[in-house]
């Protein structure tokens, strides 16, 4: 007769922990899949662009967001944005400010990094490259999908933070420095996590990667 070996208390606890971890991982996977169920993911390699050197690919939890940059509108701001993209500075950076159906904001390189998020200071961080001047002289229509650099309440304080609007905002013209526009994948941004009672998000979604189509 084979003698049954009774599991110790610690072994039972470990077993229960493993089961709970598996259930949590399984449910989290399907929660993400469900959130993104009807969002089309665009493959930039299957799209022909007129100006491929000015195409940026923002990868977020629900897929790719393809942005066309406008150096003719704001040359210094676009150059700063490209510089940070090429250094992979935006990877794993939080969408720290999200207003439902209005805008998403990211780019706090100092206090918005995954694994080192500082809730007390997020939104105030810098890139280390210094501020650049506002570029608002060229007429620009801030329609849905427009991308602009964020700033403080003062002009000429743009740095690394940027926002993308999810609806038309005509009053933003001459107020913010535009750098481009989303041409594919805006729906993926509408799935970025937000809170109903606050612009600032606890346990936020993150930028997975942000790359230029052509380096």
Protein language model features and the residues they cover:
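Cyclophilin-like peptidyl-prolyl cis-trans isomerases
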Residues: 1-215
């Amino acid at each position: 007769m084979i003698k049954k070996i009774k599991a110790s208390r610690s072994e039972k606890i470990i077993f229960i922990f493993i089961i709970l971890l598996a259930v949590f991982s399984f449910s989290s996977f399907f929660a993400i899949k469900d959130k993104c169920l009807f969002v089309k993911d665009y493959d930039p390699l299957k799209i022909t662009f007129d100006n491929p050197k000015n195409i940026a690919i923002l990868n977020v939890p629900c897929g790719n967001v393809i942005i066309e940059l406008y150096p003719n509108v704001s040359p210094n701001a676009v150059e700063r944005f490209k510089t940070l993209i090429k250094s992979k500075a935006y990877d794993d950076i939080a969408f720290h400010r999200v207003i439902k159906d209005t805008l998403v904001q990211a780019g706090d390189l100092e206090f918005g990094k995954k694994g080192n998020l500082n809730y007390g200071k997020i939104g105030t961080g810098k890139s280390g490259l210094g501020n650049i001047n506002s570029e608002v002289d060229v007429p620009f229509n801030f329609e849905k999908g427009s991308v602009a650099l964020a700033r403080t309440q003062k002009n000429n304080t743009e740095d690394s933070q940027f926002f993308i609007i999810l609806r038309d905002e005509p009053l933003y013209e001459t107020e913010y420095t535009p750098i481009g526009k989303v041409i594919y994948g805006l729906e993926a941004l509408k799935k970025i996590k937000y809170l109903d009672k606050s612009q600032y998000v606890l346990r936020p979604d993150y930028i997975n990667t942000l790359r230029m189509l052509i380096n």
